[in-house]
């Protein structure tokens, strides 16, 4: 199985990813999140005003890990870079993630502006 095939298998429900970004002071910030793949990119969905989005706008480098939660474990560790972000379709993408991971509709909180962040993997390490 090719590395990208394993990324596609793991980067989606029910597997939760852990995204590492760099804070303004250089310290790491790690956040668990839901994710999906599209055209050899990894997409995450977040809200305007979050620490992770501010970090990504300042420094687009990321590290991401996802594991299958099995023993022996299958996992990927990915280094990549943000190649774009958009508000267009972000609410729909959020709905898709909620349905896939939780089986419910996204809460659509008042004033919450969603953003799709597109990550291009530069290095994929398959573990397991």
Give the role of each language-model region.
Residues 53-59, 75, 103:
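A short, polar/proline- and glycine-enriched secondary-structure boundary/capping micro-motif
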Residues 1-16, 72:
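Extreme N-terminal tail/first-helix region
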Residues 1-2, 73-128:
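Charged, gly/pro-rich active-site loop segments
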Residues 10-11, 56, 97, 119:
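A generic structural signal for nonpolar/aromatic side chains embedded in well-ordered alpha-helices
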Residues 7, 52-53:
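Short, hydrophobic alpha-helical packing/hinge segments within bilobed ligand-binding/sensory domains
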Residues 14-48, 54, 62-66, 77:
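Short beta-strand segments
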Residues 4, 49-50:
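Structural motif corresponding to alpha-helix initiation and N-cap regions
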Residues 25-27, 68-72, 110-111:
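A short beta-turn/loop motif at secondary-structure boundaries
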């Amino acid at each position: 199985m090719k590395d990208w095939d394993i990324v596609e298998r793991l980067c989606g429900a029910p597997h939760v990813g852990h995204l590492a970004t760099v804070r303004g002071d250089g310290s790491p910030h790690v956040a668990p999140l839901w994710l999906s793949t599209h055209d050899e990119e990894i997409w995450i969905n977040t809200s305007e005003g979050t620490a992770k989005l501010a970090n990504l706008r300042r420094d687009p480098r990321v590290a991401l890990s996802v594991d299958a939660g099995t023993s022996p474990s299958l996992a990927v560790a990915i280094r990549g870079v943000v190649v774009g972000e958009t508000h267009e379709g972000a609410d729909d993408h959020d709905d898709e993630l909620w349905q896939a991971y939780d089986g419910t509709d996204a809460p659509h909180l008042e004033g919450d502006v969603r953003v799709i962040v597109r990550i291009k993997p530069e290095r994929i390490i398959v573990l397991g």
